[in-house]
Every structure is written in structure tokens, then in C-alpha cells.
């Protein structure tokens, strides 16, 4: 039997993680416990064999891995409530936005493996980009946590000092990509497509472009060169976008988001 996993917080993120663990067969239903105050909303998970409870302490006692998936303002209260049930044999993973590892340590006061993981909303369809950092974790534990989050998408290990930047590029980045797709759809409608067809073409084109980079490991400019011809329509469109500040506005937006999160 694998490690028992307690997901503290049965909101959208917590339930998405549970679903990913099940669909990938990383964990059996009997190895997952998920907690929430209102457990009636977790009926579908219960029907799949996952244990649901409103008792955080009971879940932690039964588990080897604890995934903290609560709201940021709840972290201190929840950690204070479960810290007596944590020990050096357990793994604590926070998927809460913000909150440094040393802040968790100061509350828990246990010599154990600590992790922060930053998934994005595509975790709901097992296509997240998750950035992970850790402290006091051995290589085997780091591999285990990476494998766990690989069930819901791609994983990269980073230094904790880059977690805010990861939030911008991976989490906020979803919104940036959606805004590009929305503009693409609007342009498609203007040149003749109905909204439904334009949406499909725009979304699939972006998905295909991303897969080219992921599967081939090529640079974006290499793929751009393949669809641009002298005096062609692609280069005319790209040049007009750049004249209007396409790349610079995106870069400035990313930096503005980072300055905001760093300031707060």
C-alpha cells in the first residue's frame, strides 16, 4: 500500500488534486482522505471510495502526507490545530498562495520535510504547471512529491525565492493566455467566423503551438520561421502587432504583476 494522503481543504484545488491522484492511479481511493467543514459537497468523492471528514486531526493522524489546500487566511489556524499530530515521519505540503516555508516551520515547530507547491487552474483537467520548492527533504521525498504533482500536469523544482515569480508566470499566466485567445476569437469573428468556430480554432491553435514547444523542445522563433514567408500575411500581421506593442505590453504586464505580488 502507498502513502496515505490527507488533503486539508476540499475546495476546488483540493478536490482537483484528489481527482488527479485517482485518475492517474498514483493513489488508491482508500489511500486518500479529504477534509472540509461542509462534507456534503464532497459526495462525489465519497462515492469513489475516498474518505471524507470534517476532522482535520483525524485525517492527519491517519496519513503520511499532508497537503494544505485551505485559503491563505486559514493557514495559521489550521496549522495550529494539527501541529500536535505532525511528526518527523510526515511530509507537509502547502499549495496555498503565499506563505513561506519558514513561516510554516515557526508554527509547526517540527523537524520534518516541508514543501510549497504552486499549481495553476488547469489542475482541474490534470494539465497544471506546478512549481515546487522544499526544505529538509531528502532526494527520495522530493521525488515522491514531484511524482505526486506530475499526476496533475507538469512539474518543475525551483528555489523558494522564485515562488512569487512562478505564481506570475504559471498561475497568472493562465489569465494572460486566455486574454490572447479571447482577442484571437474576436479577430476571427471580425474576419468571418461565428463565435463557436472561432473559439475552437483559436483554442486548438494555441494548444498545438504549446505542444510543438513541449514535445520538440524548440524555440518559439524557430516555429514562427516555419510559417512566415517573404511578403506573406503572417509576417505582416506579426509586424503590425509588434508596432502596436504586443511583446512589450505582455512583458510589462508580467513585470507589473510581479511588482504587485512582491510589494504585497
Regions found by a protein language model. Give the residues of each.
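NAD(P)+-binding Rossmann beta1-loop-alpha1 motif at the extreme N-terminus of oxidoreductases
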Residues: 1-54, 58-61, 127-128, 189-190
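Short acidic capping loops at alpha-helix termini that bridge into adjacent secondary structure
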Residues: 28-31, 88-90, 196
Amino acid at each position: 500500500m502507498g502513502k496515505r494522503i490527507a488533503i486539508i481543504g476540499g475546495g476546488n484545488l483540493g478536490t482537483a488534486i484528489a481527482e488527479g491522484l485517482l485518475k492517474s492511479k498514483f493513489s488508491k481511493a482508500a489511500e486518500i482522505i479529504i477534509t472540509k467543514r461542509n462534507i456534503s459537497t464532497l459526495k462525489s468523492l465519497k462515492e469513489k471510495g475516498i474518505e471524507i471528514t470534517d476532522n482535520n486531526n483525524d485525517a492527519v493522524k491517519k496519513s503520511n502526507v499532508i497537503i494544505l489546500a485551505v485559503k491563505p487566511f486559514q493557514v495559521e489556524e489550521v496549522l495550529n490545530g494539527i501541529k500536535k499530530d505532525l511528526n518527523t515521519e510526515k511530509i507537509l505540503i502547502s499549495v496555498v498562495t503565499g506563505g513561506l516555508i519558514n513561516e510554516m516551520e515557526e508554527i509547526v515547530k517540527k523537524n520534518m520535510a516541508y514543501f510549497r507547491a504552486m499549481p495553476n487552474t488547469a489542475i482541474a483537467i490534470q494539465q497544471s504547471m506546478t512549481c515546487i520548492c522544499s526544505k529538509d527533504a531528502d532526494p527520495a521525498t522530493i521525488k515522491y512529491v514531484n511524482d505526486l504533482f506530475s499526476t496533475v500536469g507538469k512539474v518543475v523544482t525551483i528555489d523558494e525565492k522564485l515562488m512569487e515569480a512562478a505564481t506570475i508566470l504559471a498561475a497568472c499566466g493562465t489569465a494572460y493566455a486566455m486574454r490572447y485567445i479571447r482577442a484571437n476569437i474576436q479577430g476571427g469573428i471580425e474576419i468571418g467566423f461565428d463565435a463557436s468556430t472561432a473559439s475552437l480554432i483559436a483554442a486548438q491553435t494555441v494548444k498545438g503551438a504549446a505542444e510543438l514547444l513541449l514535445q520538440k523542445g524548440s524555440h518559439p522563433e524557430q516555429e514562427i520561421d516555419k510559417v512566415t514567408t517573404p511578403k506573406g500575411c503572417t509576417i505582416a500581421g506579426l509586424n503590425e502587432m509588434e508596432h502596436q506593442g504586443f511583446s512589450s505590453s505582455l512583458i510589462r504586464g508580467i513585470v507589473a504583476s510581479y511588482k504587485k505580488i512582491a510589494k504585497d
